[in-house]
């Protein structure tokens, strides 16, 4: 096994954003962002969450404090970097993954890489707003490089999740578009075949907005020999922005992990 880097290394802190450290936490919850997203939204979860959890939000290259870095070329490059950053903080504590949309796929590939290289698995993976990676119903990602700025604006308004005042601010939109294009390119290249057997042994939970157009979240069950369940919450693709839904997710995750630790 490769030697883990120091838990306080700049590399680790660059990739993982932990705004609210909790040394007494029993579990570490690693959160993965949606396409075009940063780490701040999920890092803030750590302020109001069960005391048994410490939240670390993944910060991808090309945004926030990593603004000057080039974007990743594919999802495996992203996962490899995350695994390197994770190793120092998951050696002594149980951990789980939560990903929304694009982040669900990053969480999956990160889990598979951890298992392949280090024989480690999260206790649980929580996926949100994402079709199974091998599903024929997985939405086709538009080639954003072929869209005008105005077309991207309309696409974001239709999709939801990005505040309208930000989308209508031309300067903000021009900063955001490169992030979205980079992540959309990664998703577009991500091809995942249906496995002939379970790849993981952990439990998977799916969350979905009642008005989301995402289909076949149930297909995630094909990836694990563990249990699988789905929870539908009111809202669209970004249903988790609603405080009630966010609280439900955080409380559910805490209960799941506490029960997992007893088995």
Curated annotation (Swiss-Prot):
Keywords: Acetylation, Cytoplasm, Fatty acid biosynthesis, Fatty acid metabolism, Hydrolase, Lipid biosynthesis, Lipid metabolism. It is an enzyme of class 3 (hydrolase). Gene3D superfamilies: alpha/beta hydrolase. The modification N-acetylmethionine is found at residue 1. GO terms for biological process: lipid biosynthetic process; medium-chain fatty acid biosynthetic process. Changing residue 101 to A: Loss of thioesterase activity. Changing residue 237 to A: Loss of thioesterase activity. It is found in: Cytoplasm, Cytosol. Interacts (via C-terminus) with FASN. PANTHER family: S-ACYL FATTY ACID SYNTHASE THIOESTERASE, MEDIUM CHAIN, THIOESTERASE. This is S-acyl fatty acid synthase thioesterase, medium chain. It comes from Rattus norvegicus. The lineage of its organism: Eukaryota, Metazoa, Chordata, Craniata, Vertebrata.
